[in-house]
Regions:
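A short acidic, helix-capping loop that chelates divalent metal ions and anchors anionic groups
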Residues: 98, 155-161
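Short Gly/Ser/Thr- and charged-rich N-terminal loops/segments
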Residues: 10-17
Length: 229
């Protein structure tokens, strides 16, 4: 995992200790985010299991268009599969479902309730991840209590077109210089781009189509993990 930023004279007391405890929670480098619409040849559960066989240790269930009961049913299935492979499960947005299925964490968007509100509801039961797209968002999200962030899109990708021009590697580097929590780069990352992203300071990468769009999901996962070492 990327090196932690050293504490400065301007840091509030205890910041370094809190950062270290958060990094211990976030003990993965490859973060798989689901999109069942990318998976044509099998069920989403089967596709995720292939990725877990390949070595993924963290999965975010992100199926925003599902009815609540369908999502809950799918979350229970994902919890069963991820436990089998000793992997972490995060639920997108829905703190209630994350708690109901005993997920490891929740992942928030910029239009979700803030991390501080999640902490009031869930205490320390959930690891809190959050999506960010700029330096200001990253700083505010850390201040609100997130344990880690995704940042991007780093490169152009169909799933992130609404965010406009990708901020790119230089902005990723600036974000890493300003926050102390782990940062996962997201957006258009292919295996030959991983080194550039990690050299910019990313603690890991988050992938959707990069894994789920592959013909051999388990092998594609292994390819990413090999270059992440």
């Amino acid at each position: 995992m990327g090196s932690q930023k050293s504490v400065s004279f301007g840091d509030p007391p205890g910041r370094e200790v809190r950062s270290q405890s958060k990094i211990k929670k976030v003990n993965f480098r490859l973060y798989l985010i689901t999109d069942r619409k990318l998976v044509a040849r099998c069920s989403l559960a089967a596709a995720v299991e292939e990725a877990l066989k390949g070595g993924v240790k963290a999965v975010q269930l992100r199926e925003k268009d599902l009815e609540i009961r369908e999502l809950l049913q799918m979350a229970y299935k994902m919890r069963e599969i991820t436990k089998k492979y000793k992997a972490k499960l995060f639920i997108n947005d829905r703190v209630d479902i994350a708690l109901a299925v005993d997920a490891d964490g929740v992942h928030l968007g910029q239009s979700s309730i803030p991390p501080s509100a999640v902490r009031k509801v869930a205490g320390n039961k959930l690891i809190i991840g959050a999506s960010t797209h700029g330096i200001k968002e990253a700083l505010e999200t850390e201040k609100s209590g997130a344990d880690f962030i995704t940042f991007g899109p780093i490169y152009k990708t169909p799933s992130k077109l609404k965010y406009g021009k990708p901020p790119g590697i230089d902005v990723l580097r600036k974000v890493k210089s300003k926050v102390s929590i782990p940062v996962f780069a997201i957006g258009g990352i292919k295996t030959d781009m991983v080194k550039e992203v990690m050299d910019a300071g990313a603690d890991g990468i988050a992938l959707i189509s990069g894994i789920l769009g592959a013909e051999d999901i388990a092998e594609r996962t292994r390819e990413f993990l090999r270059v992440l070492k």
